């Protein structure tokens, strides 16, 4: 992640005019959940297009197998141990750890330290308008997006999951409810587009679109559920869908129709934003970055996806838990279809 941010900070220096920056972060998305990375079940044409339009990094890793430490690293460019956030915020750590392990996990920080300079603060001081939408989960009141360099915050607060689910009403103190049934990823994309469309400033923008998707609870619309139910049935249901790996069963196949619908909904939201950039003629001067915070949930929680051939998934320090997609489109710098 530190190397990625080094590239990230250097890119604006390569152009006479400061480019806009759109950073898209998925939640609990395993690298094998994407069509362009080999999934034959999930459909992600808009995310695939980002990978194909720019540079695809083939050895991308997150700094942790769970969300809060990884997100803190993305914001700061520092490793979790240096920041003091080494587990998801809210997890029992230190003397609160109730298992019979001989070694206790370290005490975990509850917020991103105020003394740390974030990427949003650095860009804001460099003349950028800054915007955040979606999942935060690296601090509550006094340590939210607004306290770390973001001028606008739509939906980011202490919670690591969408308290009201993926359809309005959202029960989110930082996001006004839309019409009943409005899909959360689509709403976050629309909020991002509204920010991008603002005409009252000549400043470049830094928009951080941080989806709650595809974190649990796994939910989708009836139409998308039916689409992926038929797809799973047509492909033939696997006889051996789970295998034990140490203490937990691990999902072996990608055939969950609810998760398939969630993936498509998030991908459609990505498409709303990237197509909006093109509509406004901003795609030629906007750096687009896509990644995820940790691996897919193949064991525990909803057992929603499979990370094979990578071992493990979210919460485990094997490849499935930390291997990530990293895609960057930087007009005039990256070449379409290139890899590194």
What would you call each of these model-derived segments?
Residues 26-42, 49, 58, 62, ...:
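Active-site-proximal cap/lid insertion segments
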Residues 51, 124:
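Anion (oxyanion) recognition and catalysis
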Residues 1-4:
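Positively charged n-region of N-terminal signal peptides that target proteins for export
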Residues 127-138:
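Short, well-structured beta-strand/strand-turn elements
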Residues 6-16:
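Hydrophobic h-region of N-terminal signal peptides that target proteins for export
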Residues 81-119, 171:
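His/Cys-centered metal/cofactor-coordination and adjacent catalytic loops
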């Amino acid at each position: 992640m530190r190397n990625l941010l080094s590239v990230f900070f250097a890119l604006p220096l390569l152009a006479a005019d400061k480019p806009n920056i759109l950073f898209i972060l998925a939640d609990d998305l395993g690298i094998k959940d994407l069509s362009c990375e080999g999934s034959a079940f999930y459909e992600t044409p808009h995310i695939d297009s980002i990978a194909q339009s720019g540079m695809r990094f083939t050895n991308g890793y997150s700094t942790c197998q769970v969300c809060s430490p990884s997100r803190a690293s993305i914001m700061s460019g520092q490793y979790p141990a240096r920041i003091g956030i080494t587990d998801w915020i809210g997890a029992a750590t230190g003397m609160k750890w109730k298992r019979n392990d001989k070694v206790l996990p370290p005490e975990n920080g509850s917020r991103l330290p105020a003394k740390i300079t974030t990427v949003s603060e650095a860009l804001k001081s460099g003349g950028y308008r800054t915007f955040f939408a979606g999942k935060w989960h690296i601090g509550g009141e006094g340590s939210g997006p607004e306290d770390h360099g973001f001028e606008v915050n739509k939906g980011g607060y202490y919670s690591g999951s969408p308290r009201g689910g993926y359809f309005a009403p959202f029960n989110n103190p930082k996001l006004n409810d839309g019409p009943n049934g409005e899909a959360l990823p689509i709403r976050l994309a629309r909020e991002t587009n509204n920010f991008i469309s603002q005409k009252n400033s000549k400043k470049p923008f830094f928009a951080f679109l941080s989806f709650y998707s595809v974190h649990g609870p796994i939910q989708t619309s009836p139409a998308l559920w039916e689409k992926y139910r038929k797809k799973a049935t047509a492909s033939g249901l696997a006889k051996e869908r789970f295998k034990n790996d140490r203490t937990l069963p691990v999902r072996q196949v990608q055939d969950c129709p609810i998760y398939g619908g969630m993936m498509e909904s998030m991908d459609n939201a990505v498409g709303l934003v990237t197509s909006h950039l093109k509509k406004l003629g901003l795609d030629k001067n906007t750096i687009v970055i896509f990644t995820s915070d940790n691996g897919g949930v193949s064991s525990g929680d909803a057992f929603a996806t499979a990370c094979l051939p990578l071992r493990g998934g979210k919460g485990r320090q094997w490849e499935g838990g930390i291997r990530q997609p990293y895609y960057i489109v930087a007009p005039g710098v990256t070449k379409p279809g290139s890899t590194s």
